A protein has these predicted regions:
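C-terminal peripheral helix-coil segments that are non-catalytic and often amphipathic
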Residues: 63, 91-156
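Short, basic, alpha-helical segments at the C-terminal edge of helix-turn-helix-like DNA-binding modules
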Residues: 1-2
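Hydrophobic alpha-helical connector segments
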Residues: 5-54, 71, 75
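A general structural signal for well-ordered secondary-structure junctions
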Residues: 34, 67, 84, 119-120
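Amphipathic alpha-helical interaction elements
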Residues: 9, 26, 63-67, 130
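Charged, solvent-exposed alpha-helical segments that act as regulatory interaction surfaces
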Residues: 6, 33-34, 87-91, 151-155
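A contiguous pocket-lining binding segment that forms or flanks enzyme active sites
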Residues: 54-92, 96, 103-108
Length: 156
């Protein structure tokens, strides 16, 4: 956590929030095992290094105009998105059984469903899901979150 360096404010909460999210993703990506450690954490984070990034993020959201309750909830939403995205990038959400017999059976079942036309929407999206760069996906999600905060505040 001490490696997280909150980016300097640019005076635009949209960019400040996105830059902080990018930095958090970068830091988490540098340490693949930190996600497991965080998931196993049984007590609240209370060290100065662990709470400063939280304080900074909530400050950005308060600066956007959110009241303290909405800022806290938005903090959890942004955090869940960033950590979930990093877990997905690291393959933690897919499972560790790649190549084993059960996983190969699941892939075969999935291929049959696609071939049979049972998943028309997913089939249509598969090329995009497969080829979309991680950075592009991450930025798309950040844009949705930032626009959601603006919507909550009655801005377009």
């Amino acid at each position: 956590m001490s490696e997280f360096d909150p980016p300097a404010s640019r005076g635009d909460w949209h960019e400040d929030a996105k830059n902080a999210a990018r930095e958090w993703r970068r830091m988490l990506s540098l340490h693949p095992h930190v996600m497991t450690l965080m998931a196993e954490q049984r007590k609240p984070l209370t060290t100065p290094d662990s709470v400063r990034p939280m304080d900074s993020a909530i400050g950005v959201l308060r600066g956007a105009g959110l009241d303290v309750r909405d800022a806290a909830q938005a903090f959890h939403t942004f955090g869940g998105y960033i950590m979930g995205f990093v877990m997905m990038e690291q393959g933690m959400m897919i499972g560790h059984g790649e190549g084993d017999e059960a996983h190969l059976r699941e892939l075969a079942d999935f291929a049959q469903m696609v071939a049979a036309g049972e998943l028309p929407h997913l089939t249509e999206a598969l090329p995009i899901l497969h080829d979309c760069a991680a950075d592009e996906q991450f930025e798309f999600g950040l844009d949705l979150l930032v626009r959601g905060v603006d919507s909550k505040l009655g801005r377009s």
